[in-house]
Design a protein with these regions (language model features):
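N-terminal nicking endonuclease/strand-transfer module with a His-rich metal-binding environment
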Residues: 1-226
Length: 226
């Protein structure tokens, strides 16, 4: 069983594109979460140089197309979380790699980092928004999140894993029971707790740690995390 989420990554104000890419990929490939890089794989890129390679592809895209949209998406992250005790780190990495390959149709470079530091094993799949030919960008289409979840379900079934059943509107999840559907608020809450475990010096540092995980901070009368 795997719950998925598709996150569009943007360049943060005050930081270069290369810095933003490095922040996001460094968090995903954190040795403390991947057993010193044991559970990292890649497609058409080198994990140690992925930020530089992604950044170089943006320059090549600009050279070829002369297009540089404001607020452009620099990369996408697929968060894929598995039910505790159902999968090994090795198989989770395989499922993540297949998900990245089939969702991008093999047209975009990506890394897969499998985090094993929590009860539920989960993948961070980061793929370049620019394609391998550096002449097109991945476009987040309508219902892409639904398409991603269905693809993940298919791959899970192919691996003999369970999938998230469709629950009836009237159903309620009892406290203490593992939910059939992983609540996105629970995922966000855990990510915030993970950031707090790193003991940020202040609120600004906490927001920076959340941005490194792929969240976008919206400024206004009230700050929001998306």
């Amino acid at each position: 069983m795997a719950a998925t989420r598709l996150i569009a990554m943007h360049q943060n104000k005050g930081r270069s594109l290369a810095q933003c890419l490095k922040d996001r990929t460094d968090y995903a490939m954190n040795g403390a979460k991947t057993e010193d890089g044991r559970y990292i794989s890649s497609y058409q890129c080198t994990p140690e140089l992925v930020d530089l390679e992604f950044a170089q592809s943006k320059k090549e895209y600009l050279r070829k197309t002369w297009r540089q949209p404001k607020g452009d998406v620099i990369a996408y992250q697929i968060r894929q979380s598995f039910k505790p005790g159902e999968i090994t780190p090795e198989e989770a990495g395989e499922v993540g790699y297949e998900t990245g390959m089939r969702f991008t149709k093999g047209k975009h470079a990506f890394i897969v980092a499998t985090h094993v530091d929590k009860a539920h094993i989960h993948n961070h799949i980061i793929f370049n928004s620019t394609n391998l030919d550096c002449d097109r960008k991945f476009r987040d289409f309508w219902f892409s999140a639904i398409a991603l979840q269905r693809l993940s379900d298919i791959i899970c079934l192919e691996h003999g894993l369970s999938i998230i059943p469709k629950s009836k509107p009237s159903e309620r999840v009892k406290r203490g029971k593992y939910p059939d559907r992983i609540n996105i608020r629970d995922v966000i809450r855990e990510d915030i707790l993970n950031a707090l475990e790193q003991k940020p010096a202040d609120f600004a540092q906490l927001l920076k740690l959340l941005q490194d995980q792929g969240y976008e901070i919206k400024q206004g009368d009230r700050k929001s995390v998306v």
